[in-house]
Amino acid sequence: MENKSRYKTIDHVICVEENRKIHVWETLPKENSPKRKNTLIIASGFARRMDHFAGLAEYLSQNGFHVIRYDSLHHVGLSSGTIDEFTMSIGKQSLLAVVDWLNTRKINNLGMLASSLSARIAYASLSEINVSFLITAVGVVNLRYTLERALGFDYLSLPIDELPDNLDFEGHKLGAEVFARDCFDSGWEDLTSTINSMMHLDIPFIAFTANNDDWVKQDEVITLLSSIRSHQCKIYSLLGSSHDLGENLVVLRNFYQSVTKAAIAMDNGCLDIDVDIIEPSFEHLTIAAVNERRMKIEIENQVISLS
C-alpha cells in the first residue's frame, strides 16, 4: 500500500503476519542524475528511525540511486510493535520482508547499507537474500561485547531468570529476557557466530569502522573480513568518529560522503572509493530533514485518529 502525500519521499506500508505493518520510505533518483544499476536499501542502526537517514538518502539520490529505507517491527519509528519486544530475529524478519516486497515489485538488483546493530542482522540474512554488494558502517560483529560496552555490564553472562525486566539502551527500554533468549537460541551473541554467517560470502563487501568507536573493536572487524574466503572485501576507517556517526556535522558529512562514494564504486564493481560525488547543499539537506520529520508526524497522527 502506498500513501500519497505532498512530500518527495514516498511512504509505503507492507502488511505482514498478525496484521502487523512495516513502513517503507522510497526516495527516487534525482532527475538528470547518473544512472545506477542497483537500488540501495538502508537498514538503520538500533534506536534510529528512517528520518534519521534523510541526509544520506539525499546524497545517494543526488548521485543517481533509488533509495529504500524502513523501520523494523518492534522498534522505534512507524512500524508495528514496541521496542520492549524487539529481538535480533525480529529485525531479520523485517529486513527479509522488505526485500521480498521489493522483489514482488520487480526490484531485484539491490545493494545494502547497514549500520551498527543492523549490520549484524544483515550478516545473518545474506544467505537468504540476493544482493549485489554490502556496505556496513560501525557494524556490530560481536554483539555481546557491544552490549556490554553500551550497557555497562555483560548481561548476557547472567542466567535468564536473573536478568532485569528491561535494559536501558540509549534511553530505550529493551525487554531483557526476550532479547537474551533470542540471542542464545538463534546464535547472535558472539564474533564466532558472525564469522560463521559470513565466511562463505561471495559478494563485494566494504566495512567502515570508526577510529574512536568504543563499541566495536576494529581488530574484530579485521578478523571477520580475513575469514571471508572470497576476499572481495575492504575496510575503511572514518577518522575522528565514534560509534555515533551523527555526533557532529563534520563526522556526519564524512559519513555521507564516504558511504556515497562506496555505493558508487560498488555499483561499478569496484572496492576503491576514490570517486567523485555530487554533494547536496546544506540548505537542501535541512529542507529534506524537516520535511521528513513533518511527514513522520503526519503519519503518526493518522494512526492515532484511526485508533
From Swiss-Prot:
Pfam families: Acyl_transf_2 (PF02273)
Keyword Acyltransferase: yes
Source taxonomy: Bacteria, Pseudomonadati, Pseudomonadota, Gammaproteobacteria, Enterobacterales
Pathway membership, UniProt: Lipid metabolism; fatty acid reduction for biolumincescence
EC number from the UniProt entry: 2.3.1.-
Active site: S116 (charge relay system), D213 (charge relay system), H243 (charge relay system)
Role played: Acyl transferase is part of the fatty acid reductase system required for aldehyde biosynthesis; it produces fatty acids for the luminescent reaction.
Top enzyme category: transferase
UniProt xrefs under HAMAP family: LuxD
Gene Ontology MF term list: acyltransferase activity, transferring groups other than amino-acyl groups
Alphabetical UniProt keywords: Acyltransferase, Luminescence, Transferase
Protein's UniProt name: Acyl transferase
Similarity remark: Belongs to the LuxD family.
NCBIfam families associated with the record: PRK13604.1
GO biological process, one term: bioluminescence
Keyword Thylakoid included in the entry's annotation: no
